[in-house]
Amino acid sequence: MNGMEHTWAPIGIDQVARRFAAIDVDWWVAGGLAIDLFLGFESRCHADIDLEMFRRDREALFDAFEGWELFTVAQGALTRWNPGETIEDPVFGIWGRPSPDAAWGVEVMLADGDGDTWRFRRDNKISLAREKLTHTTPNGIRYCTPEVQLLYKSKQARPKDDVDLAHCLHRMTTDQLLWLANAVARTSAARPWIGVLEASMKPQHE
């Protein structure tokens, strides 16, 4: 790899949408930007754009990003990925760039599931129906529902993740909060988020 391997110049979400419009697969915005799309405002600057799609649809990336170099990312190592090559289940990250000397332009994460049901990669017993997995902005950009995105964030729960949770708490439905509380309790029972989530579900008069 060259010296550009960790330099990023992410393409804009409009360009992403145009590229994926040419292929018939589900994709959605993930990461911190998904939280902002749910909130309806920019809560902070985002250095990159995280995208997600079902693992079964991964080959479509060669059509969406025709001519680009695609690499799998696992344990800090980047490996060139070519059409027809298998990506083993533990590997879920893909980086792309338009040329060997270019900065990285896109990151795509592969989601577990069968297309009808999304499953949490760290515990496949945690699931969500496909129709509840994403929401769509007025201009047609699909993004990950906040309870799933916050579940991903709960493992490390950095200060910025705590802020994301605080922003979302009073905008999420009771069903969303309950799903997240149960999922966080199952994956990391000691997380302080559990108490925050439970408190947010109490009736206001209590």
Locate the predicted segments by residue.
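Compositionally biased terminal segments of proteins
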Residues: 1-206
